[in-house]
């Protein structure tokens, strides 16, 4: 699996799209720091970009890589190599290269700007960690969708629909539920609903770390009371890890049972 991981990693790192992805974040970091001298405000702006863009890129790259490397994958399947090793190696290779492009692309401008001497270092570190988690999560979900659909058009459609649901539609349903059932105690419902969506969970963790939970109103107070504690932070971290582990398990399971 490690050899396939390394091959997929270097293959994607040589791709021009990886350079475009890296340069986009590099330029974004430079422009934000040029226009804004406050590192905390720059981190907030980056959060709004990363929360939406990183899942989208992870989803698209994951689906594209699977379908574009299908012939090479079929060649590997003819070799005495475990199926799960092939697809897990490809997944980790793609996700790792995307996460590195994100971390290095955003990290370089902030390092040269002096982020290590700023109090915003922990906020920025959390931003990069959640960005890496979202990359691994949505790349895994993309591989699950691609493995489940031989039709390329269907695979792309389902992948984009998944991203749209997680990033936009889920929030709309969540807010409508809060408004419709406002006469009922919704503290536990809000916490559970947030943890069931990695995008919302990442956003809440960053907002609480930036100490701007007041922007979320009453819900923000509930989140601060729970996620602001050590137990809440540990539980949310476990949930993010589970969001990586569960789709990865499905990749292994589908690859093992799928008839190629």
Regions found by a protein language model. Give the residues of each.
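Hydrophobic alpha-helical transmembrane segments
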Residues: 1-3, 38-46, 67-78, 100-109, ...
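Aromatic- and glycine-rich beta-strand/loop motifs that create alpha-glucan
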Residues: 1-20
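Central hydrophobic cores of alpha-helical transmembrane segments
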Residues: 22-26, 156-165
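Secretory targeting signals
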Residues: 30-50, 93-158
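Long, hydrophobic alpha-helical segments
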Residues: 46-69, 91
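Helix-loop-helix units of permease transmembrane domains in multi-pass membrane transporters
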Residues: 65-96
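Terminal transmembrane helical anchor/hairpin motif
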Residues: 169-245, 249-253
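Short cytosolic juxtamembrane segments of multi-pass membrane proteins
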Residues: 255-260
């Amino acid at each position: 699996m490690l050899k396939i991981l390394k091959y997929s990693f270097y293959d994607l790192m040589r791709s021009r799209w990886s350079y475009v992805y890296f340069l986009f974040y590099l330029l974004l970091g430079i422009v934000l720091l040029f226009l804004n001298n406050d590192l905390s405000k720059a981190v907030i702006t980056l959060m709004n970009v990363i929360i939406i863009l990183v899942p989208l890129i992870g989803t698209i790259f994951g689906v594209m890589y699977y379908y574009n490397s299908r012939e090479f994958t079929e060649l590997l399947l003819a070799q005495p190599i475990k199926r799960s090793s092939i697809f897990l190696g490809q997944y980790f290779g793609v996700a790792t290269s995307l996460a590195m492009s994100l971390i290095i692309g955003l990290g370089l401008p902030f390092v040269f700007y002096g982020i290590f001497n700023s109090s915003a270092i922990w906020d920025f570190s959390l931003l990069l960690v959640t960005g890496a988690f979202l990359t691994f999560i949505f790349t895994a979900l993309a591989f699950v969708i691609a493995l489940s659909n031989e039709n390329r058009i269907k695979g792309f459609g389902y992948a984009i629909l998944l991203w749209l649901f997680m990033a936009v539609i889920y929030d709309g349903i969540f807010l409508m539920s809060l408004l419709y059932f406002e006469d009922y105690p919704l503290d536990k419902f809000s916490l559970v609903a947030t943890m069931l969506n990695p995008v919302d969970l990442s956003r809440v963790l960053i907002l609480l770390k930036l100490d701007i939970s007041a922007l979320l109103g009453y819900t923000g107070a509930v989140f601060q009371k729970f996620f602001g504690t050590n137990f809440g932070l540990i539980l949310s971290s476990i949930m993010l890890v589970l969001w990586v582990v569960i789709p990865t398990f499905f990749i292994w399971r589908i690859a093992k049972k799928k008839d190629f």
